[in-house]
């Protein structure tokens, strides 16, 4: 799934992906964002080797809350990490809704579900079961191990840290 903020660029990128022989991909944008929005209609370009199909996505029609882009605003990296952790711990609200909407679309693009609705449901269940938070913890642990391995690796002759 590729997010594109520029509505004019999104169909062009989708067509390039098709021409490159992409098996399945989604190019999404909405209301100036590089993701599907909660405050209006988002657009999803469904890319396959044969075509690019344009689909409008209305989050409210999918049972999600309506929220302005400003209500979803984050901040610096530490703030954004904290906001994501809260969603992955099960906090409800607009931030969770935008996460499950976009994760649901990614699950559909990856062939894990048959419909966007079932993708949203699977994303929500994954959060509610604690699996998303658990995965984030495993990714962090793996990053720490990789960082330690890099730091412990011998430096090439003449290299400076």
Residue ranges with predicted function:
Residues 1-161:
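Glycine-rich anion-binding loops and their surrounding alpha/beta cores
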């Amino acid at each position: 799934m590729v997010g594109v903020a520029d509505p004019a660029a999104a169909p062009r990128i989708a067509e390039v992906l098709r021409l490159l022989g992409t098996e399945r991909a989604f190019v999404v944008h909405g209301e100036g964002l590089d993701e599907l929005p909660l405050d209006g209609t988002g657009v999803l370009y469904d890319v396959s080797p044969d075509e690019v199909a344009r689909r409008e996505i209305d989050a409210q029609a999918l049972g999600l809350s309506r929220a302005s882009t400003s209500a979803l605003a984050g901040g610096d990296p530490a703030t954004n990490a904290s906001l994501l952790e809260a969603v992955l711990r099960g906090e409800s609200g607009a931030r969770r809704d935008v996460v499950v909407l976009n994760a649901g679309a990614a699950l559909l693009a990856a062939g894990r579900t048959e419909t966007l609705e079932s993708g949203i449901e699977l994303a929500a269940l994954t959060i509610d079961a604690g699996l998303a938070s658990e995965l984030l913890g495993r990714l962090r642990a793996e990053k720490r191990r990789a960082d330690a391995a890099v730091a412990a690796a011998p430096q090439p002759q003449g290299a400076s840290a």
